[in-house]
Amino acid sequence: VALWNKVVERNPGCAIVDASGIIPALRSVKSSSEIKMIQSAVDFTARGFADAMQFVAPGINEYKVQATLEHGYAMAGGRGSAFPPIVGGGLNSTVLHYKDNDQDLVAGDLVCIDSGAFYAGYGADISRTVPVSGKFSKRQKEVYEIVLKAEQAAIKAVKPGVTLGELDAIARTIITKAGFGEYFIHSIGHHLGLETHDTCGPMAPLKKGAVITIEPGIYLPEEALGVRIEDDIEVTATGYKNLSKAIPKSVSAIEKAMAK
Protein backbone atom coordinates (compact mmCIF):
# COMPACT_ATOMS: atom_id res chain seq x y z
CA VAL A 1 0.00 0.00 0.00
CA ALA A 2 2.79 2.39 0.89
CA LEU A 3 4.48 1.70 -2.43
CA TRP A 4 1.23 2.25 -4.32
CA ASN A 5 0.71 5.58 -2.56
CA LYS A 6 4.15 6.68 -3.69
CA VAL A 7 3.38 5.66 -7.26
CA VAL A 8 0.15 7.67 -7.21
CA GLU A 9 1.94 10.70 -5.81
CA ARG A 10 4.47 10.66 -8.63
CA ASN A 11 2.01 9.64 -11.35
CA PRO A 12 -1.35 11.37 -10.76
CA GLY A 13 -4.29 9.64 -12.42
CA CYS A 14 -2.67 6.22 -12.70
CA ALA A 15 -4.84 3.19 -11.97
CA ILE A 16 -4.49 -0.55 -11.46
CA VAL A 17 -5.72 -2.47 -14.49
CA ASP A 18 -6.27 -6.22 -14.61
CA ALA A 19 -3.93 -7.42 -17.36
CA SER A 20 -4.27 -11.12 -16.59
CA GLY A 21 -6.04 -11.79 -19.88
CA ILE A 22 -3.54 -10.00 -22.08
CA ILE A 23 -0.62 -12.43 -21.82
CA PRO A 24 -2.71 -15.56 -22.56
CA ALA A 25 -4.17 -13.85 -25.63
CA LEU A 26 -0.69 -12.95 -26.86
CA ARG A 27 0.64 -16.44 -26.20
CA SER A 28 -2.24 -18.07 -28.05
CA VAL A 29 -0.87 -16.73 -31.35
CA LYS A 30 2.61 -17.94 -32.25
CA SER A 31 5.15 -16.11 -34.37
CA SER A 32 6.71 -17.89 -37.34
CA SER A 33 9.83 -18.48 -35.23
CA GLU A 34 7.80 -20.09 -32.47
CA ILE A 35 6.03 -22.36 -34.94
CA LYS A 36 9.41 -23.42 -36.36
CA MET A 37 10.56 -24.42 -32.88
CA ILE A 38 7.37 -26.38 -32.26
CA GLN A 39 7.81 -28.06 -35.65
CA SER A 40 11.36 -29.00 -34.67
CA ALA A 41 10.08 -30.51 -31.43
CA VAL A 42 7.49 -32.48 -33.42
CA ASP A 43 10.14 -33.68 -35.87
CA PHE A 44 12.32 -34.91 -33.01
CA THR A 45 9.26 -36.60 -31.56
CA ALA A 46 8.73 -38.43 -34.84
CA ARG A 47 12.17 -40.03 -34.47
CA GLY A 48 11.35 -41.20 -30.95
CA PHE A 49 7.99 -42.65 -32.00
CA ALA A 50 9.58 -44.44 -34.95
CA ASP A 51 12.11 -46.05 -32.63
CA ALA A 52 9.42 -46.93 -30.08
CA MET A 53 7.17 -48.56 -32.67
CA GLN A 54 10.05 -50.78 -33.72
CA PHE A 55 10.89 -51.60 -30.11
CA VAL A 56 7.42 -52.43 -28.75
CA ALA A 57 6.94 -56.17 -28.26
CA PRO A 58 5.45 -58.60 -25.74
CA GLY A 59 7.47 -58.74 -22.52
CA ILE A 60 9.04 -55.30 -22.94
CA ASN A 61 8.53 -53.08 -19.90
CA GLU A 62 6.71 -49.78 -20.36
CA TYR A 63 9.65 -47.81 -18.95
CA LYS A 64 11.94 -49.28 -21.61
CA VAL A 65 9.58 -47.94 -24.27
CA GLN A 66 9.81 -44.57 -22.51
CA ALA A 67 13.61 -44.82 -22.57
CA THR A 68 13.53 -45.61 -26.28
CA LEU A 69 11.34 -42.58 -26.95
CA GLU A 70 13.60 -40.23 -25.02
CA HIS A 71 16.76 -41.66 -26.56
CA GLY A 72 15.26 -41.01 -29.99
CA TYR A 73 14.43 -37.43 -29.04
CA ALA A 74 17.99 -36.80 -27.89
CA MET A 75 19.61 -38.41 -30.92
CA ALA A 76 17.43 -36.31 -33.23
CA GLY A 77 18.32 -33.06 -31.47
CA GLY A 78 15.70 -32.68 -28.75
CA ARG A 79 16.44 -31.56 -25.21
CA GLY A 80 14.46 -34.10 -23.25
CA SER A 81 10.71 -34.55 -22.92
CA ALA A 82 8.16 -31.75 -22.80
CA PHE A 83 6.31 -33.67 -20.04
CA PRO A 84 6.60 -37.09 -18.37
CA PRO A 85 5.83 -39.65 -21.09
CA ILE A 86 2.75 -41.83 -20.80
CA VAL A 87 3.31 -45.43 -21.89
CA GLY A 88 0.33 -47.55 -20.89
CA GLY A 89 -0.28 -51.10 -22.04
CA GLY A 90 -3.50 -53.07 -21.65
CA LEU A 91 -5.64 -51.73 -18.81
CA ASN A 92 -3.14 -48.91 -18.34
CA SER A 93 -4.07 -47.60 -21.78
CA THR A 94 -7.45 -46.63 -20.30
CA VAL A 95 -5.89 -44.46 -17.57
CA LEU A 96 -5.92 -40.89 -18.87
CA HIS A 97 -2.82 -39.60 -17.09
CA TYR A 98 -1.09 -42.89 -16.38
CA LYS A 99 2.40 -42.23 -15.03
CA ASP A 100 3.86 -45.40 -13.51
CA ASN A 101 5.22 -46.89 -16.76
CA ASP A 102 6.36 -49.99 -14.88
CA GLN A 103 4.42 -52.94 -16.33
CA ASP A 104 5.49 -55.48 -18.93
CA LEU A 105 3.61 -55.30 -22.23
CA VAL A 106 1.36 -58.27 -22.95
CA ALA A 107 0.78 -59.94 -26.31
CA GLY A 108 -2.59 -59.02 -27.78
CA ASP A 109 -2.88 -55.73 -25.87
CA LEU A 110 -2.68 -52.16 -27.12
CA VAL A 111 -0.20 -49.65 -25.73
CA CYS A 112 -1.06 -45.95 -25.67
CA ILE A 113 1.97 -43.67 -25.98
CA ASP A 114 1.50 -39.96 -25.20
CA SER A 115 4.72 -37.98 -25.30
CA GLY A 116 6.63 -35.17 -26.96
CA ALA A 117 10.14 -33.84 -27.34
CA PHE A 118 11.22 -30.50 -25.88
CA TYR A 119 13.24 -27.96 -27.84
CA ALA A 120 14.18 -24.29 -27.29
CA GLY A 121 11.42 -23.73 -24.74
CA TYR A 122 8.68 -25.42 -26.77
CA GLY A 123 7.33 -28.95 -26.79
CA ALA A 124 5.38 -31.39 -28.90
CA ASP A 125 2.44 -33.45 -27.62
CA ILE A 126 1.65 -36.57 -29.64
CA SER A 127 -0.37 -39.70 -28.93
CA ARG A 128 -0.33 -42.95 -30.84
CA THR A 129 -1.90 -46.25 -29.84
CA VAL A 130 -0.21 -49.34 -31.22
CA PRO A 131 -0.67 -53.12 -30.93
CA VAL A 132 1.90 -54.83 -28.72
CA SER A 133 2.05 -57.82 -31.07
CA GLY A 134 2.37 -55.65 -34.18
CA LYS A 135 -1.11 -56.32 -35.58
CA PHE A 136 -4.48 -54.93 -34.50
CA SER A 137 -7.19 -57.42 -33.60
CA LYS A 138 -10.62 -57.03 -35.21
CA ARG A 139 -12.03 -55.38 -32.07
CA GLN A 140 -9.02 -53.11 -31.60
CA LYS A 141 -9.23 -52.02 -35.22
CA GLU A 142 -12.96 -51.32 -34.87
CA VAL A 143 -12.44 -48.97 -31.92
CA TYR A 144 -9.31 -47.43 -33.42
CA GLU A 145 -11.03 -46.55 -36.69
CA ILE A 146 -13.82 -44.74 -34.82
CA VAL A 147 -11.31 -42.61 -32.91
CA LEU A 148 -9.36 -41.95 -36.11
CA LYS A 149 -12.53 -40.88 -37.94
CA ALA A 150 -13.37 -38.49 -35.10
CA GLU A 151 -9.87 -37.05 -35.05
CA GLN A 152 -9.73 -36.54 -38.81
CA ALA A 153 -13.13 -34.83 -38.85
CA ALA A 154 -12.11 -32.44 -36.09
CA ILE A 155 -8.79 -31.65 -37.77
CA LYS A 156 -10.50 -30.91 -41.09
CA ALA A 157 -12.74 -28.37 -39.32
CA VAL A 158 -9.83 -26.36 -37.89
CA LYS A 159 -9.72 -22.79 -39.16
CA PRO A 160 -9.67 -19.25 -37.76
CA GLY A 161 -12.84 -18.42 -35.82
CA VAL A 162 -13.64 -21.97 -34.74
CA THR A 163 -13.41 -22.83 -31.04
CA LEU A 164 -11.99 -25.92 -29.38
CA GLY A 165 -15.48 -26.45 -28.01
CA GLU A 166 -16.89 -26.68 -31.53
CA LEU A 167 -14.14 -29.09 -32.57
CA ASP A 168 -14.92 -31.18 -29.50
CA ALA A 169 -18.56 -31.39 -30.55
CA ILE A 170 -17.60 -32.65 -34.01
CA ALA A 171 -15.46 -35.47 -32.65
CA ARG A 172 -17.84 -36.28 -29.81
CA THR A 173 -20.81 -36.61 -32.17
CA ILE A 174 -18.98 -39.25 -34.21
CA ILE A 175 -17.91 -41.21 -31.15
CA THR A 176 -21.36 -40.96 -29.58
CA LYS A 177 -23.13 -42.14 -32.74
CA ALA A 178 -20.81 -45.15 -32.73
CA GLY A 179 -22.03 -46.00 -29.22
CA PHE A 180 -18.98 -44.92 -27.23
CA GLY A 181 -19.93 -41.43 -26.09
CA GLU A 182 -19.62 -42.20 -22.38
CA TYR A 183 -16.11 -43.53 -22.98
CA PHE A 184 -14.75 -40.28 -24.43
CA ILE A 185 -13.84 -38.89 -21.02
CA HIS A 186 -11.87 -35.74 -21.78
CA SER A 187 -11.96 -32.71 -24.06
CA ILE A 188 -10.75 -32.65 -27.65
CA GLY A 189 -7.49 -30.83 -27.02
CA HIS A 190 -5.70 -27.71 -25.88
CA HIS A 191 -3.36 -24.94 -26.96
CA LEU A 192 0.31 -25.89 -27.25
CA GLY A 193 3.31 -23.61 -26.75
CA LEU A 194 5.57 -22.65 -23.87
CA GLU A 195 3.52 -25.07 -21.80
CA THR A 196 2.06 -28.38 -22.91
CA HIS A 197 -1.39 -27.19 -21.85
CA ASP A 198 -0.80 -23.61 -22.89
CA THR A 199 -2.89 -20.61 -21.95
CA CYS A 200 -6.21 -19.72 -23.63
CA GLY A 201 -9.53 -21.39 -22.96
CA PRO A 202 -11.63 -23.76 -25.08
CA MET A 203 -14.29 -21.21 -26.02
CA ALA A 204 -11.99 -18.53 -27.45
CA PRO A 205 -12.12 -18.39 -31.27
CA LEU A 206 -8.93 -19.75 -32.81
CA LYS A 207 -6.69 -17.29 -34.60
CA LYS A 208 -4.13 -17.70 -37.35
CA GLY A 209 -0.88 -18.75 -35.71
CA ALA A 210 -2.43 -20.76 -32.90
CA VAL A 211 -1.11 -24.28 -32.34
CA ILE A 212 -3.49 -26.80 -30.79
CA THR A 213 -3.76 -30.51 -30.15
CA ILE A 214 -6.59 -32.67 -31.43
CA GLU A 215 -6.82 -35.84 -29.33
CA PRO A 216 -10.07 -37.80 -29.12
CA GLY A 217 -10.09 -41.13 -27.34
CA ILE A 218 -12.17 -44.12 -26.32
CA TYR A 219 -11.36 -45.91 -23.07
CA LEU A 220 -12.92 -49.29 -22.27
CA PRO A 221 -11.55 -50.49 -18.92
CA GLU A 222 -13.80 -53.56 -18.92
CA GLU A 223 -11.93 -54.65 -22.07
CA ALA A 224 -8.52 -53.31 -20.98
CA LEU A 225 -8.62 -51.37 -24.24
CA GLY A 226 -7.86 -47.68 -24.62
CA VAL A 227 -7.26 -45.70 -27.80
CA ARG A 228 -6.10 -42.10 -28.08
CA ILE A 229 -4.82 -40.43 -31.25
CA GLU A 230 -3.30 -36.96 -31.01
CA ASP A 231 -1.73 -34.56 -33.49
CA ASP A 232 -0.33 -31.04 -33.24
CA ILE A 233 -2.16 -28.63 -35.53
CA GLU A 234 -1.23 -25.12 -36.67
CA VAL A 235 -4.11 -22.80 -37.50
CA THR A 236 -3.38 -21.15 -40.86
CA ALA A 237 -5.08 -18.25 -42.64
CA THR A 238 -7.43 -20.58 -44.51
CA GLY A 239 -7.46 -23.73 -42.41
CA TYR A 240 -4.81 -25.85 -40.80
CA LYS A 241 -1.44 -27.57 -41.12
CA ASN A 242 -0.84 -30.90 -39.40
CA LEU A 243 2.64 -30.51 -37.93
CA SER A 244 2.80 -34.20 -36.99
CA LYS A 245 1.48 -35.80 -40.18
CA ALA A 246 4.76 -37.69 -40.68
CA ILE A 247 4.14 -39.89 -37.64
CA PRO A 248 2.34 -43.12 -38.70
CA LYS A 249 -1.33 -43.06 -37.77
CA SER A 250 -3.48 -45.31 -39.94
CA VAL A 251 -3.80 -48.98 -39.03
CA SER A 252 -1.77 -50.04 -42.05
CA ALA A 253 0.92 -47.39 -41.50
CA ILE A 254 1.36 -48.36 -37.85
CA GLU A 255 1.56 -52.06 -38.64
CA LYS A 256 4.12 -51.32 -41.34
CA ALA A 257 6.17 -49.16 -38.95
CA MET A 258 6.15 -51.98 -36.38
CA ALA A 259 7.15 -54.74 -38.79
CA LYS A 260 10.38 -56.34 -37.62
Locate each region found by the language model.
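Active-site neighborhoods and metal-handling regions in enzymes and metal-associated proteins
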Residues: 1-260
